[in-house]
Each structure stands twice: as structure tokens, then as C-alpha cells.
A protein has these predicted regions:
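Conserved glycine-rich cofactor-binding loop
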Residues: 15
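N-terminal Rossmann-fold NAD(P) dinucleotide-binding loop
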Residues: 19-20
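Rossmann-like NAD(P)(H) cofactor-binding subdomain of soluble oxidoreductases
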Residues: 89-157
Length: 350
């Protein structure tokens, strides 16, 4: 079986649970024959176990040295931040993990400025992704964050409720921030071909049940901690590798991703939009839902802006007016109007 590429993939945080699962997933998918495992704690144990798995003609290296890890890297996935613990929100990780993101961005700029794509998954991902983008000097289309986990949680919940396969639940999406203020969109969802909007408010699925499901989706990460005693690791690992696979030339990624947004309404922020992610990177359109859904998206954006402004106060990023000094190439890649309708129609069929 051929590899998608022979270019170097660096996995940051590879000694941890998410990182080590990303390594195994990437090897199983045969993404590349050149994988580097990087962590501040030696990931050699992970590398040795992967070698002993017998994946064959793959170069697996492990290092704690940033220069070795990032030099010649063309693709990067980073889970290299502190995980969320019981009782914590993603926002509680803001200062420490954004400082880590600053270092990551600077390492990218110094050692692999020609990297093709970077996926950020450590929380709060919208902000750690933004910080990485700013300090890396990369284009917005080259840096994305994991947001799909919220959409798959909605899909999973609906599939369980209506006793259907997840593949029969289409159009699931959450937009805005990857946190409890996310905007859950149900207006484009179909269950086995039937619009969800025709089911909500019936005895089969009451308004109260739908509201509770949306709340449960926004707290899906906390539920995993409750059930397993630790934060999610298998699902974010798999979805993030699927993201990098899409950029390497695999099937386009079918769920929303976090991307840098620059519109008249939403600006100077990273958040989940209706996106395409493929070999050209990330491109987005602004989702259109019901008035209530759009208002939720506005509120999610405002919440992200408050955290972004806190990063300015903490001196992790400069004032917005000075962002061009550290990354002048921040023009976002929004799809033109002729592609927006096509993109959204295709998403609703996913």
C-alpha cells in the first residue's frame, strides 16, 4: 500500500495519550513514511512501541529537541498543551497553553517556515490556534484547529436518539468557539433523509429534549472526563489525523474546522465556520442558520473576543493594530459568493 506522501509529519505532544494515539492512527492510515515524534518528555517509548508494531518501511524518530523535530517538517499536528481535568473548562487553560502556542509558532517560523499545514488541538484551541498562526508567520489557510469533535458529538447523540447509524444523520455542525459557548446548528440536519426541524417539537422529540441535547453536546468533553476519569484522547486524535490526511491529498475533511476569520461581522479571531479542508488548505463561508442559531454564533464570537483581548492584557499577543508586525500575511481565505452556496449545499449532504 502506497503512502500519501513521503514528506515529514511532526507530531507535537507525542508522549501523551492524544499524541501517541495520533502517531498510531497516522501509521495505520499510511500517511507518510517519515514521522517525527516530539515532546518535552521523551517520546522514545512511544516510538519504540510503534516500531515493534511492525508498520514496515517507515522512518520513526523521537526527540525532545525542537530544531530536530521541526526542521524539514511539512505537516504538523500539535496536542502539546496541558489537558483539561475534572472541574475545569477549556478556558481555564488559556494562559499556560497560549504561552506554549507562542513557542510553537516561533519554532515553526525559525525551523520550518515552508511547512504546508499545521493542525492545533490543545485547548482552548481557538486561541492556541490564533497564537500559533500569529507567531508562525503562516497564511490563515495553513493553520486550522480541531472543531469537528463537537459536530460528531451532535451526530452521535442524534443517532442514538433515533436509533440510526451515524452516517444517516447528515448536516450536523457546531460553529463558533470550541467551548461551552459554541453555537449548535440543527436547522440543516436530516435524520435518514427527514429534516430535523420537522421532528423537533413533536412527541417523538420534544423542544425540551432538543434543548437538553444541545446543552449536553456543549458539555461533551466534561462528560468523557466523568465517564473515563480523564479527558478525551481517542476521538481528538483520530479527527485531527483525518484533518492532516485531507491536506496531504486524502478525502476532503467533511466537518467544520477552526480557521482564521476576517469578515465585516467577525474579525481577528479563529473559530469554526462552514469550511472546506483539502490540499489547498482551509477555506470558509459564514454559516447561515435560524435567527436563534445566528444569535448564538454572535455570542460565541463575542466570548472568543473577550479571551483574545485577555491575551493582549497578558502580553502573550500584541494589540490587534500591531499584528501585522509579527504576521503580515493574515488575509483569510473566504470562498467567493459563487462557491458559498455550493459549499453549504455539499456540507448538508455529508
Amino acid at each position: 500500500m502506497e503512502f500519501l506522501t513521503n514528506e515529514k509529519l511532526t507530531i507535537v505532544g507525542a508522549a501523551g495519550m492524544i499524541g501517541s494515539n495520533m502517531v498510531q492512527t497516522a501509521l495505520t492510515m499510511r500517511l507518510t513514511n517519515d514521522i517525527c515524534l516530539y515532546d518535552v518528555f521523551s517520546p522514545e517509548g512511544v516510538a519504540e512501541e510503534m516500531r515493534q508494531s511492525g508498520f514496515g518501511d517507515v522512518k520513526i524518530t523521537a526527540t525532545t529537541d525542537a530544531k530536530e523535530a521541526f526542521t524539514n517538517a511539512k505537516y504538523i499536528i500539535s496536542s502539546g498543551g496541558a489537558p483539561r481535568k475534572a472541574g475545569m473548562t477549556r478556558e481555564d487553560l488559556l494562559k499556560g497553553n497560549c504561552e506554549i502556542a507562542e513557542g510553537l509558532g516561533k519554532n515553526i517560523k525559525e525551523y520550518c517556515p515552508d511547512v504546508k499545514h499545521v493542525v492545533i488541538i490543545f485547548n482552548p484551541a481557538d486561541l492556541t490556534g490564533l497564537v500559533t498562526l500569529l507567531y508562525s508567520g503562516l497564511k490563515p489557510s495553513q493553520v486550522t484547529t480541531l472543531a469537528a469533535l463537537d459536530s460528531t458529538r451532535l451526530q452521535s447523540a442524534l443517532a442514538k436518539k433515533f436509533n440510526v447509524m451515524q452516517s444517516e444523520v447528515k448536516g450536523c455542525a457546531t460553529y463558533g468557539g470550541h467551548g461551552e459557548q459554541m453555537a449548535v446548528f440543527g436547522s440543516h440536519v436530516t435524520i435518514d433523509g427527514k429534516p430535523l426541524t420537522e421532528i423537533i417539537g413533536t412527541p417523538e422529540f420534544t423542544n425540551e429534549e432538543w434543548e437538553q441535547m444541545k446543552t449536553d453536546v456543549t458539555k461533551g468533553g466534561a462528560k468523557i472526563i466523568e465517564l473515563r476519569g480523564r479527558s478525551s484522547f481517542q476521538s481528538p486524535a483520530y479527527l485531527s489525523v483525518e484533518m492532516i490526511r485531507a491536506v496531504m491529498g486524502g478525502e476532503p475533511f467533511k466537518y467544520p474546522v477552526g480557521t482564521y476569520v476576517s469578515t465585516d461581522k467577525y474579525n481577528h479571531i479563529m473559530m469554526a465556520m462552514n469550511t472546506t479542508l483539502d490540499t489547498t488548505g482551509a477555506h470558509y463561508t459564514v454559516p447561515q442558520g435560524t435567527a436563534e442559531e445566528n444569535a448564538k454564533l454572535d455570542a460565541s464570537y463575542e466570548h472568543l473576543c473577550k479571551m483574545r483581548d485577555e491575551l493582549v492584557t497578558l502580553n502573550i499577543v500584541p494589540e490587534i493594530s500591531k499584528w501585522n508586525e509579527i504576521n503580515p500575511d493574515r488575509k483569510s481565505t473566504r470562498l467567493n459568493s459563487s462557491h458559498q452556496a455550493i459549499s453549504y449545499a455539499v456540507f448538508c449532504l455529508k
